[in-house]
């Protein structure tokens, strides 16, 4: 069984990834504020071991406001206001999962610790500038992460919200994994079909049908 050290270690030896990390380092060194902090960039892999992954939720790039991003897609630190997309995720959960109570914070570590890989496809961003690090090579790295999960694991659930995530997920073998798609939970698109998608109960039904412990979504 592979682990993240194998996957990330192999990629870190590649020139493209060394270039990515160098570009981020140079941006920080030049005085730019880059999110998340250096020690949090790879948190998705720290909280969810390769062999423990049950569900993959793909985000795009980190939140670009102060004190928000901490390396898990959609998640924010406990003391920070819940961002609109995450609020809509919670709204769907209240409709989808019996007994789910609207959380008071957006800190999703509890999901990560249960096997929900909260993976942004770009792992850094400059303060106040969405998608500013979109062309640094992160996409190639996260494509590799998805490919390795697809190949070396089975019976995973991939939640792909919005066209960006769905494009990233085209390679996933749908005979071995469950792939659920919906519009992005952003206020701009949630009403086009994210609300009512019931992805959280569908995820748990699939896991349980394969003898895998379901996710407790309550935060």
Curated annotation (Swiss-Prot):
Name this protein carries in UniProt: Uracil-DNA glycosylase
Species of provenance: Haemophilus influenzae (strain ATCC 51907 / DSM 11121 / KW20 / Rd)
Family indicated by similarity: Belongs to the uracil-DNA glycosylase (UDG) superfamily. UNG family.
PANTHER family assigned: URACIL-DNA GLYCOSYLASE
Signal peptide: none
Catalytic residues in the record: 61 (proton acceptor)
Intracellular or extracellular location(s): Cytoplasm
UniProt keyword DNA damage present: yes
EC number(s) stated in the UniProt entry for this protein: 3.2.2.27
Domain of life: Bacteria
Gene Ontology CC terms, in alphabetical order: cytoplasm
Main location: cytoplasm
UniProt entry keywords in alphabetical sequence: Cytoplasm, DNA damage, DNA repair, Hydrolase
């Amino acid at each position: 069984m592979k682990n993240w050290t194998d996957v990330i270690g192999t990629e870190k030896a590649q020139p493209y990834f060394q270039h990515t990390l160098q570009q981020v380092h140079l941006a920080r060194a030049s005085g730019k504020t880059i999110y998340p902090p250096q020690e949090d960039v790879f948190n998705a892999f720290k909280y969810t071991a390769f062999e423990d992954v049950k569900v993959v939720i793909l985000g795009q790039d980190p939140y670009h406001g102060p004190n928000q991003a901490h390396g898990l897609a959609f998640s924010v630190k406990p003391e920070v206001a819940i961002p609109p997309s995450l609020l809509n995720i919670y709204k769907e959960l209240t409709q989808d999962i019996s007994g789910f109570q609207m959380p008071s914070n957006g800190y999703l570590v509890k999901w990560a610790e249960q096997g929900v890989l909260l993976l942004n496809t770009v792992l850094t961003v400059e303060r106040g500038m969405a998608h500013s690090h979109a062309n640094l090579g992160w996409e190639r790295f996260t494509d590799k992460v998805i490919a390795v999960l697809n190949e070396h694991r089975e019976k995973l659930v991939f939640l792909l919200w919005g066209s960006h995530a769905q494009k990233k997920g085209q390679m996933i073998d749908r005979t071995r994994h469950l792939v659920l798609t919906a519009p992005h939970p952003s206020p701009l698109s949630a009403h086009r079909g994210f609300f009512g998608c019931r992805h959280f109960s569908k995820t748990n039904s699939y896991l349980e049908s394969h003898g895998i412990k379901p996710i407790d979504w309550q935060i």
